UniProtKB/Swiss-Prot annotation:
One of its GO terms (biological process) is translation. The lineage of its organism: Bacteria, Pseudomonadati, Thermodesulfobacteriota, Desulfuromonadia, Desulfuromonadales. InterPro entries: Ribosomal_uS10 (IPR001848), Ribosomal_uS10_CS (IPR018268), Ribosomal_uS10_dom (IPR027486), Ribosomal_uS10_dom_sf (IPR036838). The keyword Ribonucleoprotein applies. It comes from Syntrophotalea carbinolica (strain DSM 2380 / NBRC 103641 / GraBd1) (Pelobacter carbinolicus). Part of the 30S ribosomal subunit. This is Small ribosomal subunit protein uS10. Involved in the binding of tRNA to the ribosomes. One of its GO terms (cellular component) is ribonucleoprotein complex. Belongs to the universal ribosomal protein uS10 family.
Length: 102
């Protein structure tokens, strides 16, 4: 597994949950002897929705909602076989989307 790197990209709506998951991954990787670059915060995507408050009239009365998607990027530079096994066994929170590229 030498001269490879594992790129982990995490997405979540809750930034606190995302940071907890990132810390778990970093601790696991460092415990097994791998070097970690990051976490690098990527730009937050903000989706805004504008809806009418009433069902019939009054177009001027609207309500605005927004959904923020927070993202982080981790690079595990020198992974060992123990690192890969530990990352496979790691149980992260349900609200975090994880993408792993080798």
């Amino acid at each position: 597994m030498q001269s490879q790197k594992i790129r982990i990209r995490l997405k979540a709506y809750d930034h606190k949950l995302l940071d907890l998951s990132v810390n778990e991954i970093v601790d696991t990787a460092k415990r097994t002897g791998a070097r970690v670059a990051g976490p690098i915060p990527l730009p937050t995507i903000i989706n805004k929705y504008c809806v009418l408050r009433g069902p019939h009239v009054d177009k001027k009365s609207r309500e605005q909602f927004e959904m923020r998607t927070h993202k982080r990027l981790l690079d595990i530079v020198e992974p060992t076989q123990q690192t890969v096994d530990a990352l496979m066994k790691l149980d992260l929170s349900a609200g975090v989307d994880v993408e792993i590229k080798l």
